[in-house]
Amino acid sequence: ETLLARLARARSVLVLTGAGMSAESGIPTFRDAQTGIWSRFSPQELATPEAFARDPGRVWQWYEERRKAVRSAQPHAGHRALVQLETMVPDLTVVTQNVDGLHQLAGSGKVWELHGNILRSRCHLTQRPIGSDWLADSPHSPPRSPYVEGGLARPDVVWFGEVLPTAAVEAAAAAASRCDFCFSIGTTSLVQPAASLPLVALEHGAALVEINPAETPLSPYASLSIRGKASEVLVTLVSEFAAWTRHNDA
């Protein structure tokens, strides 16, 4: 049975995406974002609760610069191909390690963000969301919380040493357990718990296709491991699947 036939038979599809998916939209990876004045800081000095407690202004400013890059980015053809694929299968879940919201911007319906979203903010004390209007009106950097004295706005992302959002982790685990077909796209397959999701899918009998420019620890386990850019590979794959479906439905 070909992989296209397995995809056609799949009742549920899981798509796991990492930094490589966003890099093609011009969003620098976490490491690449440390350019210019930021190159002298380690990630631990910019993306930990301790760093924020020590120098909230510096951390907020770094994230402001990263937000600018995210706001000017657009989904690429690979994001749009996943939206098209969603219309061709009964159930498709995107689980992403990216914090840029590009899957939602492209039109994906079911997206779980394991590491949060850089365009959202929340109070660092109450964890309640803070709206963009409040942030825009604030003269402070970071803006003060509207909820509690001493509270500050912080990016709604997962910093080093923090726990991942429970709802997203549980939804991702459930999607991995129930899927018949899993894609791992643009991820190094090193960061947990995301790295284990394709292995959970395999254990439950799913087919696994990896799309990444370089080999990863996941590559030996994949039914098919494709070296290439997510945008190009996904467009080809989805159009081939569409053609296969038309031919076999005829």
PLM feature segments, named:
Residues E1-A250:
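Conserved catalytic core of sirtuin-type NAD+-dependent deacylases
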